[in-house]
Design a protein with these regions (language model features):
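Amphipathic, Lys/Arg-enriched alpha-helical "gate/interface" segment within cytosolic domains
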Residues: 1-129
Length: 129
C-alpha cells in the first residue's frame, strides 16, 4: 500500500489549513503538494475566508530530512505562487530537519514541538507574526 506523503485539511471556521507531511519526498511530490495547497486555499476562499487571513499548521513530525533538490523546489514553489499564509506554525521533532526548515523559513513562520502552543499562536488575535 503506498504511503500518503501529505494530507491537507481546510478548516474554514478557523481560516486554517491543517497539513500533515510524512516520509521522504521527491521533486514530483513538491509539485503535487503545491497543487493540493492551491486547491485547499481555493476551498477556504470559496467558503468565505479572506486569503490574507489564512494560517497554516504543518505537522512535519513524521517527515524525513529531505534532499537539497526537494528543499530548493519547495522554497521556489512557495515564493513563486505567493501562497504564503499570514502565519505558518510548523511542528517538528527532528533536530536535523529543524535545521533544514530554519534555513528556508519565512518571516511569519514559527517552529513548535507541541501542537497546543502552535494553535495558540496561530489563532491569537495579535497581528504581529
Amino acid at each position: 500500500m503506498p504511503v500518503h506523503l501529505f494530507d491537507i485539511i481546510p478548516d474554514a471556521r478557523r481560516s486554517m489549513l491543517r497539513i500533515t507531511m510524512r516520509g521522504h519526498w521527491i521533486t514530483e511530490t513538491v509539485e503535487e503538494y503545491r497543487v493540493a495547497v492551491a486547491r485547499a486555499v481555493a476551498t477556504l476562499i470559496e467558503n468565505g475566508c479572506k486569503r490574507e487571513r489564512i494560517v497554516a499548521l504543518v505537522d512535519a513530525r513524521e517527515v524525513s530530512a529531505q534532499s537539497q533538490d526537494v528543499i530548493e523546489e519547495y522554497q521556489k514553489n512557495m515564493v513563486r505562487d505567493g501562497r504564503v499564509p499570514r502565519r505558518l506554525a510548523t511542528l517538528l521533532s527532528s533536530a536535523l530537519f529543524k535545521r533544514q526548515v530554519e534555513r528556508i523559513a519565512m518571516p511569519n513562520q514559527r517552529i513548535f514541538s507541541h501542537e497546543h502552543e502552535a494553535l495558540a499562536w496561530l489563532l491569537s488575535s495579535d497581528d504581529d507574526a
